[in-house]
A protein has these predicted regions:
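Glycine-rich helix-loop "coupling/hinge" segments at transmembrane-helix boundaries
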Residues: 135, 146-149, 161, 176-177, ...
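Hydrophobic alpha-helical transmembrane segments of membrane transport/permease proteins
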Residues: 3-4, 8, 36, 40-79, ...
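C-terminal transmembrane helix and the adjacent membrane-cytosol boundary/short C-terminal tail
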Residues: 163-164, 210-220, 259-295
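Transmembrane alpha-helix signature in integral membrane proteins
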Residues: 35, 83-115
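Generic hydrophobic transmembrane alpha-helix motif, especially the helices
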Residues: 73, 77, 83, 107, ...
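Transmembrane alpha-helical segments of polytopic membrane transport and secretion proteins
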Residues: 1-39, 278-295
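Membrane-water interface segments at the C-terminal ends of transmembrane alpha-helices
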Residues: 36-55, 90, 129-152, 162, ...
Length: 295
């Protein structure tokens, strides 16, 4: 699931004017729908910072498993906590983990990929072998090893997911950058005496940004799935901090009695992942020069 998206070699073009981009974007159904779903999740997380219908941390056993009502719009869970409040606070936890984890993967992955492409030789070989080694440890396995050392928690899931993001972004960056290094304008820059670092910053990185932006949306979706899985297994976000994965864990023993307790967090995860994937598809179509000319 974490393999990089397939995009043809980057084409050096002038940046698309912002007005042209947004005019085309608002006509692209995948981009609009994906953006709307993603903004819905982001808005839920932001709202939870200042308001929730009830405290997501307050336990009221007397109110457990209540059906939807005017007081509790989606009912309550087995601890008497308001479902809407848990979903809002869970969105905050999920986005926090996803943003930090993807930032870790992006920082190290892009840096290593650019270095491998610029230096070549033994430097490239070492970086790519390190990438292969890291790729052998999925997020769940990394979280288990980290939990054995420092204990389970949000930090454990962030580090584990972040490490798992690195090899994918390293490979994508290196492959995309190699295509740019072979182009005439880069060869001309080298002939003019520009160093590898300057060429990387001025020519290579700007020409692969669109590919990286699209891939980040895919990696963010994978991070949400990984965070939910780790929290469900008890390795990620710990009580009393709400998490969609933790909500699924709490609901598994009540599937026949109250199946909606599992449906709500499952739907939240599905909406988040679907929105990011649609957004990524839309950005790919809008930012790829070949696809842009075809539309």
């Amino acid at each position: 699931m974490s393999a990089p998206i397939t995009i043809d070699a980057p084409v050096a073009t002038r940046p698309m004017p912002a007005r042209t981009f947004w005019r085309r974007a608002l006509r692209h159904r995948s981009f609009v729908l994906g953006g709307a779903l993603s903004l819905l999740v982001l808005a839920s997380a932001l709202v939870s910072l200042v308001w929730t219908p009830w405290s997501p941390y307050e336990i009221d056993i007397a109110a457990k498993l209540r059906p939807p009502s005017a007081a509790h719009w989606l009912g309550t869970d087995s601890f008497g906590r308001d479902i809407v409040s848990l979903l809002l606070a869970g969105a905050r936890s999920t986005i926090m983990v996803g943003v930090i984890a993807v930032s870790i993967g992006l920082t190290f992955g892009v840096t290593l990929g650019l270095i491998a492409s610029a230096r070549r030789g033994w430097t490239e070989e070492i970086i790519m072998r390190f990438s292969d080694f890291t790729f052998a440890f999925p997020a769940v396995l990394s979280a288990i090893m980290l939990a054995a050392v420092v204990g389970p928690g949000m930090v454990t899931s962030i580090v584990a997911i972040g490490i798992f993001q690195i090899p994918t972004l390293t490979r994508l960056t290196r492959g995309s950058a190699n295509a740019i290094w072979a182009r005439e304008f880069v060869l001309a820059a080298r002939a003019a005496g520009k160093g590898r670092f300057r060429i990387t910053i001025e020519h290579v990185l700007p020409n692969i940004l669109s590919i990286l932006i699209v891939q980040v949306t895919i990696q963010f979706a994978l991070a949400i799935l990984a965070e939910a899985a780790l929290s469900y297994l008890g390795l990620g976000t710990q009580p009393p901090q709400p998490s969609w994965g933790r909500m699924l864990n709490d609901a598994q023993t009540l599937l026949f009695q109250s199946p909606m307790l599992a449906v709500y967090p499952g739907a939240a995860i599905a909406i988040s992942v679907l929105g990011l994937n649609l957004l990524g598809d839309g950005l790919r179509d809008l930012l790829d020069p070949r696809l842009a000319r075809e539309r």
